[in-house]
Regions:
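Residue-level detector of Asp-centered blade-edge/turn motifs that repeat once per structural unit
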Residues: 158-161, 271-272, 367-370, 489-490, ...
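Blade-edge beta-strand/turn elements of extracellular beta-propeller
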Residues: 105-121, 129-142, 213-224, 228-256, ...
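N-terminal export signals
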Residues: 50, 56-82
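Long, well-ordered hydrophobic secondary-structure segments characteristic of membrane-embedded
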Residues: 91-272, 278-284, 294-296, 300-341, ...
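N-terminal secretory signal peptides
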Residues: 1-52
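Signature of short aromatic-glycine-proline-rich micro-motifs recurring in repeat-based ectodomains
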Residues: 142-156, 254-267, 473-484, 559-574, ...
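Loop/turn-rich, solvent-exposed surfaces of beta-rich toroidal or solenoidal domains
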Residues: 562-602
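Beta-propeller fold recognition
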Residues: 190-196, 200, 213-228, 384-470, ...
Length: 680
C-alpha cells in the first residue's frame, strides 16, 4: 500500500515558531526531552485520522485526498483574508472588522478604526509604596511589590461599570532579558534569583475605565486596598482529599497541608462565586536532582519530566526545598489548581487537590443541568490528556461559604475519544463513508471520587498526586498538547485548543497511527450528551485544522479558504457574548508574529477565521478576554523580544515603551476609537 498523505500541519518534524530562548525558559526545553507518556494508550491522531478519512474530501475540498504526492505549497507566502471581499452578510453576532495581515512588526497591530494601550507592564508598582521600575537597579524587595514578569491568564472582576480588579498570572521569567550579562542560574547572583522568584505568581491590580469608552488604565493613587502580589514565597494551604497525604509532607510541613508559593501559572478560570482559579503548568523545570529521589518515586519523577542534575534557574540556591535529593516530596506540592479571592488580599490561596495534579493549562467552570460545578482542564504536554471535574454538591447562588466547598469533593474524569467509522470504509480513497459524517464520540472515564479510587493499584491520594499515571492505566486518549478548554456561553459546546506536537515522527507513521509532526495544531469541538456538563458521554468534531489556507489539507469548517486568515498553534481560547470563538496563538510556525483570531462557530460564518491583532516581535498572545459589554478586548503580551541572541544590550523589541527602552511583558487593551462594540 502506498503511504497515506499526512494531515495538515503534519509533514515534517518541527518545533514550531518559538525561539530556543522561549523553549528554555518557559518549559525547560520539553520538546528536547523524551516524551513522558510512554503508555500504550490510543493517540488522538489515530482517532481523528479515522474521522477525517471517513470524509475524504471535505466540504469545498478542504482537506484534499489523503493520498501520497498531494504536496503542500511551502514556498508561497501564507494566504490572508482578503479585505476587498465582503464575505458573508453580517447577521446577529457577526463581525465586520478588516482583518490584520500577517506581519513581523515590533508593535501591537490592530484593525483599522481600533486603538490599543498597555495597561500594566512588568515592574509597574502594584502595592502602595512600591518604587518605580528601574531596569538597571532591580531588587527582590521591589519586585515583590511590582507587577511580575511574563503575564498570561487575564480576567476582570468589575466592581462597577467603570472600575474593576484585574487578575493576571505571571507564568515564568527570562533572566536573559531581565539582567545584563546573565548566563545561567549557577552563575547568577543570589539577588537575581530572588528577583526571579518574586516575579513569578500573580497580581491583582485595580483598573478604571477611561471616559466611558473601552479603554482602561491602571489606578495609580489612593488606597488600592485590593492590590496584591502572589509569589513563590506566598503561604498557601491544601484542601480536598489529598491534603495531609504522606505524598505531600515535607520536613518544613510535616502535616502536608501548608504549601508555599505557586509556579509557572499559565491559564486559568473563574468561579461563579467570584474567585480565580489559576493553573500551575511547567513546574517541573524549577527543581534539581530529580534522579536522586527514593527508588519508589522515580517512575513518577520520570512521568512528570522532572530534570536530573543541577541546572536551570537554581532556586535551590536560595531555598533548598527545590533540591529533591533533600526534599523529594516538594515537587508534589506544585502542579495544582490554585483558588484565590481577589476581593480579600489577606486570604490564603488554596491548592485544590480534588482537581488532580499535572501541567494544568486552564480551569474553566460551568454549572451542570442539576446544579453541580464542572471544571474543564487540559494537561499541556505532548501526548497528554484532557480532564473534567464534577462536584458532588450543588451550587447555591449567594451562598459563598457553601459554594467554596464544591471544589473539595467530586469526581475527576479523563477523556477517551473514539472514531465511529467501520474499518472497511477507511480505504484512503477520499470516498465518503456511508454515514457521511466528520465526527466521533467519547466518554469521561472516572479516576477518583473523594477517597474512592477507580484506578486499580492506586489509592485516591496517589491518583490525585500522580494523575498522569492514573490516566495511563484507564486507556485515556493521548492528545497533541491540550491547552485551553472553554465552554461556549451560547451553544454549550466545549472547545479544546491543541497547540501542536512535533514529536510524532515519520518513523512512527503507519496505517493505524498515520500522523506525524503536528506543526500548526487544531481545535476540537466537544458536545456533551444532552448539553449537560456533568454528562459522561460526548460527541466531538474538528472544526479547525490550522495552517496556511493555501495548504489544501487545512480545514476551516468548510468555509471559503480564500477569505480566511492563516493561523498556527492555537493556545488560549475565549468567547464573546455572541458565542464567537477567539483564539490566541503561541509559537506561530508560519514565520510571522503571533496573534488573536476570531471564528464564528455557528451559522453561515462558521469557520470564518479572521486575525484581529498581532503582538510584537517574538511575543506570544495570551489570556484573551472580551468584556461583557463588548467594548474591550484584553490580551497579555508575553515575552516580547524573546528572540534567539537577544540581550538587554541587543534587544529584539522595544515594546511597549519605544526607542531606548527594554521590552516589558504587559497587559494591553484594545477598543474601537468611536466607542463601538468590538467587530462593529
Amino acid at each position: 500500500m502506498s503511504p497515506r498523505r499526512l494531515l495538515p500541519l503534519l509533514s515534517t518534524p518541527h518545533k514550531g515558531g518559538r525561539s530556543a530562548m522561549t523553549c528554555q525558559f518557559r518549559c525547560g526545553n520539553q520538546c528536547a526531552h523524551d516524551v513522558a507518556n510512554t503508555s500504550g494508550n490510543p493517540y488522538f491522531g489515530e482517532v481523528a485520522e479515522q474521522a477525517l478519512s471517513r470524509r475524504g474530501v471535505l466540504r469545498a475540498g478542504a482537506l484534499g485526498a489523503l493520498v501520497a504526492g498531494a504536496g503542500v505549497t511551502m514556498g508561497a507566502a501564507p494566504a490572508m483574508a482578503d479585505p476587498g471581499r465582503s464575505g458573508p452578510p453580517r447577521g446577529k453576532g457577526g463581525l465586520g472588522f478588516e482583518p490584520v495581515a500577517p506581519n513581523k512588526a515590533d508593535a501591537l497591530t490592530v484593525p483599522k478604526g481600533y486603538r490599543s494601550s498597555a495597561v500594566v507592564r512588568w515592574g509597574d508598582p502594584v502595592l502602595p509604596g512600591a518604587p518605580a521600575f528601574d531596569f538597571d537597579n532591580q531588587t527582590a524587595e521591589a519586585q515583590a511589590m511590582q507587577f511580575g514578569y511574563n503575564c498570561d491568564y487575564v480576567t476582570l472582576f468589575e466592581m462597577n461599570r467603570n472600575r474593576g480588579l484585574l487578575w493576571v498570572n505571571h507564568e515564568y521569567t527570562d533572566e536573559n532579558l531581565m539582567f545584563r550579562g546573565y548566563t545561567d542560574g549557577t552563575a547568577a547572583t543570589e539577588e537575581q534569583i530572588k528577583i526571579a522568584m518574586a516575579a513569578h505568581g500573580g497580581s491583582v491590580v485595580e483598573v478604571e475605565r477611561v471616559r466611558n469608552t473601552g479603554e482602561w488604565k491602571l489606578v495609580t493613587n489612593g488606597r488600592r486596598r485590593y492590590n496584591r502580589r502572589i509569589t513563590v514565597s506566598t503561604p498557601m494551604r491544601f484542601s480536598g482529599p489529598a491534603a495531609g497525604s504522606d505524598l505531600l509532607k515535607t520536613a518544613a510541613d510535616p502535616k502536608g497541608v501548608k504549601p508555599v508559593g505557586m509556579l509557572n501559572n499559565c491559564a486559568g478560570g473563574t468561579t461563579p462565586w467570584g474567585t480565580v482559579l489559576t493553573a500551575e503548568e511547567n513546574f517541573n523545570q524549577y527543581f534539581v536532582n530529580g534522579d536522586k529521589v527514593p527508588e519508589a518515586q522515580k517512575p513518577y519523577i520520570t512521568r512528570y519530566s522532572i530534570p536530573s542534575g543541577t541546572a536551570g534557574r537554581r532556586f535551590d540556591r536560595i531555598e533548598e526545598r527545590f533540591d529533591l535529593e533533600k526534599h523529594p516530596n516538594e515537587v508534589n506540592r506544585f502542579g495544582w489548581i490554585v483558588e484565590i479571592d481577589p476581593f480579600d488580599p489577606d486570604s490564603t490561596p488554596i491548592k485544590r487537590t480534588a482537581l488532580g495534579r499535572f501541567a494544568h493549562e486552564a480551569a474553566t467552570t460551568t454549572i451542570s443541568r442539576d446544579g453541580r460545578l464542572v471544571a474543564y482542564m487540559g494537561d499541556d504536554s505532548r501526548f497528554e490528556y484532557v480532564y473534567k471535574f464534577v462536584s458532588k454538591g450543588r451550587y447555591i447562588k449567594g451562598h459563598d461559604r457553601h459554594n467554596r466547598t464544591l471544589l473539595d469533593e467530586g469526581t475527576l474524569y479523563v477523556a477517551r475519544f473514539t472514531g465511529d467509522s467501520p474499518k472497511e470504509e477507511l480505504d484512503g480513497s477520499g470516498r465518503l463513508p456511508s454515514d457521511g459524517a466528520f465526527d466521533g464520540s467519547g466518554e469521561w472515564i472516572p479516576l477518583v471520587s473523594g477517597d474512592r479510587s477507580f484506578v486499580e493499584g492506586m489509592t485516591a491520594a496517589e491518583v490525585l498526586v500522580y494523575t498522569r499515571a492514573a490516566a495511563d492505566k484507564v486507556s485515556a486518549t493521548k492528545m497533541d498538547r491540550p491547552e485551553d478548554m472553554e465552554r461556549n456561553p451560547v451553544t454549550g459546546g466545549v472547545y479544546i485548543a491543541l497547540t501542536n506536537n512535533s514529536n510524532r515522527t515519520p518513523a512512527q507513521v503507519d496505517e493505524a497511527n498515520p500522523r506525524a509532526a503536528n506543526k500548526h495544531g487544531h481545535v476540537v469541538e466537544l458536545i456533551e450528551q444532552r448539553d449537560d456538563a456533568a454528562a459522561k458521554k460526548f460527541s466531538w468534531s474538528v472544526p479547525l485544522v490550522c495552517g496556511d489556507p493555501n495548504d489544501p489539507s487545512t480545514y476551516f469548517a468548510g468555509f471559503d479558504k480564500t477569505k480566511v486568515s492563516p493561523i498556527s498553534c492555537p493556545d488560549n481560547l475565549a468567547f464573546d457574548p455572541d458565542g464567537n470563538l477567539w483564539i490566541s496563538t503561541d509559537g506561530n510556525a508560519l514565520g510571522t508574529n503571533d496573534g488573536l483570531f476570531v471564528m464564528p462557530v455557528k451559522g453561515k460564518e462558521r469557520g470564518y477565521v479572521r486575525q484581529f491583532l498581532t503582538v510584537p516581535v517574538a511575543a506570544e498572545t495570551c489570556g484573551p478576554l472580551i468584556s461583557d459589554d463588548q467594548l474591550s478586548v484584553w490580551v497579555a503580551v508575553q515575552h516580547p523580544g524573546e528572540a534567539d541572541g537577544a540581550t538587554p544590550d541587543r534587544p529584539a523589541s522595544r515594546w511597549p515603551d519605544g526607542e531606548g527602552s527594554q521590552p516589558r511583558p504587559s497587559v494591553a487593551v484594545v477598543w474601537h476609537e468611536r466607542g463601538k462594540k468590538i467587530g462593529a
